[in-house]
Amino acid sequence: MAEEKNMTVATEEKTEATAPKTENQYLLKLNRPYVFEGKEYAEIDLAGLDKLTVQDAINAQRQLFNEREPAAMLLCETTTAFVRILAAKATGLPIEFFKLAPRSVSRRIYGMVMGYMNVDSNTENHIMRLEKPYYFEGKQYTEIDLNSVADLNSLNESAAENRLTRAGFMVTDTSYNYLYACILAGMATGLPEEFFTGLPLYEVLKIKNAVNDAGFFE
């Protein structure tokens, strides 16, 4: 029995020692250290992006709208200012860290965050398939049927616009607004708004584009 136990322990130790280490694909290693407030940074860990949700994108968009950031009025997700806010949220570093970053660093951060968000649309016949199973109130979801968006009317749009205003948004072109997409998706599916705002960050562009699909306006 002692020999068997020792063999088991040895096997476990060997397995742990030889198990491949998971590489952090969101660890940005800099070509040269970036000095911020007297401290050198040789890398920036953006793994915290996995903890962000659609709500974080909504908050960032609202902040830029309220700051009257002209570039963010339409395709907010393509702007450097938007990426800065998400990167700060993901890393816990102050926003000034990203504002003062050299362009060589800033562009790499931008590329990594945009790459994270630009997942394949994977939406067919208005069925939006999720990148990973999503759990909400004890139930698992792998796809969302948005076909009923076609049944919404002008009153629904007005109600969604009023909801935007209550949430602190100035109503401009709603087709670019993340919260507006979540509101309409909720109306169409009967799922609460929180279902959509709680989706992982990388689903934000997918839901925005799916709700505004040209097929709904033919």
Which positions does each model-derived feature cover?
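Charged interaction scaffolds used for protein-protein
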Residues: 2-54, 59-65, 73-76, 81, ...
